[in-house]
């Protein structure tokens, strides 16, 4: 299966800062995708606010697009089951190349979040930091590889149903002596997606293969 896909784009950025207290970076990108023959506009922004000398707030938001490669991204699912697109199986009466070409593989999502970092002293002044991060990715169009739709098929389709990922993370870093860093992190992920059912209904499920809890020391 051969296809050609090229993108060309322009990016513009504006930075505003108030000495070492506050900074704002606003950017916008425009891309042309040859496969879909469409233009995509993706704005984004970042802020950094030093609330005090030892307390910093960061926040960001951005819209993003991703052109998925259905076969490469899901090669592990090719275990004897047919690949089907919006209900049409590629090894039936429908040509695989036609189905693949006509399928909308462009995902669209908005990511919003930020972090709060506090520097403090344990053994000596300012030798440790504690930060809390939260980010949410909200999908407005997502390509789903549904393994539960049918026992004999992996069904690919676009869903505009409720699909999101919430990530919470806490990081601790301590340098008690020179060249010795102690680092610990804990992350909680709540990821959910909407699946279509053969009866025409929809169901909200936890995203597969995503670890809810992660910790590192």
Predicted regions: what they are:
Residues 6-8, 28-34, 61-67, 76, ...:
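Transmembrane beta-strands of outer-membrane beta-barrel pores
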Residues 17-20, 129-139, 156-217:
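Gram-negative outer-membrane beta-barrel transporters
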Residues 1, 25-30, 81-101, 150-157, ...:
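Extracytoplasmic loops and strand-loop junctions of Gram-negative outer membrane beta-barrel proteins
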Residues 50, 58, 90-158, 164, ...:
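Membrane-embedded beta-barrel scaffold of Gram-negative outer-membrane proteins
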Residues 1, 36-43, 70-76, 83-87, ...:
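Outer-membrane beta-barrel translocator domains and adjoining extracellular loop/strand segments
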Residues 2-48, 174, 178-190:
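Surface-exposed extracellular loop regions of Gram-negative outer-membrane beta-barrel proteins
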Residues 11, 23-25, 48, 56-58, ...:
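Residue-level detector of the transmembrane beta-barrel scaffold of outer-membrane proteins
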Residues 2-6, 18, 37-39, 67, ...:
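Short sequence motifs at beta-strands and strand-loop junctions characteristic
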